[in-house]
Amino acid sequence: MQEHLVVTLDGKDYLVEPGTNLLEFIKSQDTFVPSICYNESMGPIQTCDTCTVEIDGKIERSCSTVIDRPMTVNTVNNDVKDAQKEALDRILEKHMLYCTVCDYNNGDCEIHNTMDAWGLQHQTYEYKEKPYEKDYGPFYRYDPNQCILCGRCVEACQDIEVNETIRIDWDREHPRVIWDNDVPINESSCVSCGQCATVCPCNAMMEVNMEGNAGYMTDTEPGSLAAMIDLTKKAEPGYGPLFAISDSEAEMRKERIKKTKTVCTYCGVGCSFEVWTKDREILKVQPSHDSPANKIATCVKGKFSWGHINSDQRLTKPLVRKNGEFHEVEWDEALNVIADNFTSIKEKYGPDALSFISSSKATNEESYLMQKLARQVIGTNNVDNCSRYCQAPATKGLFRTVGHGGDSGSIEDLEKAAMSVLIGTNTAEAHPVIASRMKRAQKLFGQKIHVFDIRKHEMAERADRFYQPKPGTDLAWLSAVTKYIIDHDLHDKAFIDEWVDDFDEYYKSLETFTMAFAEEATGIPESELIKFAEECAKAESVVICWAMGITQQDIGSDSSTAISNLLLVTGNYRRPGTGAYPLRGHNNVQGCSDMGSMPDKITGYQSIEADDIRAKFEKEYGVKLNPKAGKDNHEMVEGIHDGEVHSLYLYGEDTGIVDSNINFVQAAFEKLDFMVVQDEFLTFTATYADVVLPASPSLEKDGTFTNTERRIQRLYQALEPLGDSKPDWKIFQAIANRLGFDWNYKHPSEIMDEVARLTPLYAGVSYDRLEGFNSLQWPVQPDGTDEPILYLEGFNFDNGKAKLFPLSFDNYFKQDEIYDIHVNNGRLLEHFHEGNMTYQTPMIKYKVPRAFVEISPELAEDRGIHEGAEVKLISETGEAVLQVHVTDRVKGKEIYIPLNNDAMENGDLGAINLLTNSDVDQYTDTPSYKRTSCRLEVITKRGKSPLNPNNFRVNKKRHPQYSVQVQKKWERSDYVFPGNQVDK
């Protein structure tokens, strides 16, 4: 096989690997060729024709040319320049250059930069205005009169995000970008991911916050702006001087527009991007091809939901309760109140009378200091985080079988799999950027997607096969499928022999898991399960993703274990495109646990009960550590009711809304002797506190987050803390010092250095290695070597072998006669968790103003109710009043309630956790949120829909196509390829 081909570029020979994109090769040699429609994250679109070069004597597009033979390429001869000039002129026929007064004149307008670099002075064709007005959506706007029809937005929507809303109508006299069947943006099925604005090479598609805000003259009234544009164009003899002026203005903007790399503060995908700020105003979020987890992708929250940063609801001063009411105080007073109460409670009841809940939204460094405060300063292991509410069972299942509690590979591996299996995960709304990777792999590369869920969400609709098991019965079908694969000799015997222990004992435990048993338990027909088992066993590579639909059950740990068992039996670990992916819900829920904010584990999952581990930390901390595992979140609440816990300190967590059975939780808060809440806002939980401390959000501090794929990334401070708020790490340090310790961290990098010294999993992590968009995936060796794919050198047990774990099942789903409706619950695309941050962005709230309940058409008909009806849901533990959205996403007596309810405005009204109970997974104490039943009472039979009429759930009309369909452009009578025109 020939390894390299000779390419002669402008007279010089190069050895090039076959399959290399010609345009990318030319760019790698620092040779300029215009390429306005090309984007390295999307590949060739072929609409702009500016990248033409001469290949073996013929003018062709370099962007779509693959080097598959020796070739001679010329980028500078007259024919090439003539063809490029023709293409550039056609672009300026569609796009008016008024750079100095354009919001996009920030140094990265690709039309401006290309024309300038090429040296274009005059355009041949006069600009032609199109008969269209600007179209404004809630977050971005489209200006057809500046659009060059490059199709990047279409490619992004159709084949990167795969939301399939945007296309170009090439058939009209004046082609333009359209949404759905040519409706306004705000009436379309657009989910507002914003990637169209991200990839637009000019000001045609632009964030609303940018308009009129970026430049020194861009806020000019439209009529005056038009006059200024005309005057400027008439005054300049050519584009050279015009570009010089606009370049000077762009340089001036650098002094007022700050671009700061950060990491998204919402879900566990870990999207990174630059945030553009002017003073405190957030202009835009701009992801990069260098963003390791997301590349150029975002979702509506990461791209646009930053209203919480400057919300007038932000806390800017400490609050101390006096005579039943909160009063603003200075930090000294607040710290003294905390120190006095912590000291008195510890002296009276002992250190285990105090408890601490860490935040999965805060940085690694802050999570580390919270557990250090609990263990070193107070002397208790009563510290936990919200992974207890969702991810602990997944981690338990992986610890049992493969030894590491994290994703097996990288997000990019999900695209490489031949088959993706999604179980109990509403990926398109909870982890939309990951969902887009899978949708793209399915659409463009034939990946097979199988979805097991009780609710027909978007991924279920798109799946090659969708299965609806009875609630809480996934372990039954998972084990039956595994048994069938072994029974029919479809298992990977070579993999098992070399890499897996306990096969015989495990196989024996599967005896009762017949396909007939699985059908009876789950309701999935035996024939469908057999077909799935055979496809799964024969697929070249399989990944399984799961989330709260699995973990928030009373057998969440066992169901997670069953997933890993299936992957081991089929040999789907230790390779790209394989493995277990428990999709983490919060931006740093992985990191928070990594940092030891757990009652039985210190950093890197080292046991606090192990003498050698404690000795290491005792040497670093200078105190003796408590050898007994502490209480987890669930046990803390019970401990308050039992009189064992007297103080609670939590930060970045609205426990009084998000914990299960919140009537029980709120009653516990009332019994506390002393409670401290640290947050951006006066949350619902904070209203129970004695002291409330104002904390700074992610844009106001430095630190690191660790995402679902174990990827550690830096975030940089973009803004100063608002008012007297402080980063959490500074608050913890102040409290520790007020209690007599001498913490002296100057920067979070020093905290991470300490973590690295103590934690084998993070041994090679340093801020220098995380500079910019660089990242590391744990475990990280001292020399900085990381592991994008786990287990290549063996599983995380002493002998390097994985373990199959025997399981049993008796978790049959039974419909209660009184509480006859099963209550499912979970995330929404627009809001995050309880919604405290997302409700602060007005246009997000406009999209989904309140919580609601999804009810099936069958149940609605049975109860005589319609869209917008008001119902009371009553469970054994409480009741909630909600408005109805009738949808076929749920069936029969299944209902679905989103987690968000805007508790800061509405209190706990309509909160799902008024209905949930205190049942938990026996191994992790994770609440069985998904094991909830209720009865329904009708208050009103119809009303106004709880969803905005323009919400994409109502306007669900996808228009899938492949790319921009450029051939339709080429078929137009007014199109001639510039190379052909030159040939003529």
From Swiss-Prot:
Ligand binding ([2Fe-2S] cluster): C37, C48, C51, C63
Family under the similarity heading: In the C-terminal section; belongs to the prokaryotic molybdopterin-containing oxidoreductase family.
Disulfide bonds listed in the record: none
Domain 2Fe-2S ferredoxin-type: 3-79
Catalytic activity: formate + NAD(+) = CO2 + NADH
EC numbers: 1.17.1.9
Matching CDD domains: fer2, MopB_CT_Formate-Dh-Na-like, MopB_Formate-Dh-H
Domain 4Fe-4S His(Cys)3-ligated-type residues, every copy: 79-119
Binding site for [4Fe-4S] cluster 3: C157, C190, C193, C196
SMART domains linked to this entry: Molybdop_Fe4S4, NADH-G_4Fe-4S_3
Pfam family, one: Molydop_binding
Residue positions binding [4Fe-4S] cluster 4: C264, C267, C271, C299
BP GO annotations: formate metabolic process; respiratory electron transport chain
Alphabetically ordered keywords of this record: 2Fe-2S, 4Fe-4S, Iron, Iron-sulfur, Metal-binding, Molybdenum, NAD, Oxidoreductase, Repeat
Binding site for [4Fe-4S] cluster 2: C147, C150, C153, C200
UniProt-recorded Gene Ontology molecular function terms: 2 iron, 2 sulfur cluster binding; 4 iron, 4 sulfur cluster binding; formate dehydrogenase (NAD+) activity; metal ion binding; molybdopterin cofactor binding; NADH dehydrogenase activity
4Fe-4S Mo/W bis-MGD-type domain span: 257-313
Organism: Staphylococcus aureus (strain MSSA476)
Protein name: Putative formate dehydrogenase SAS2201
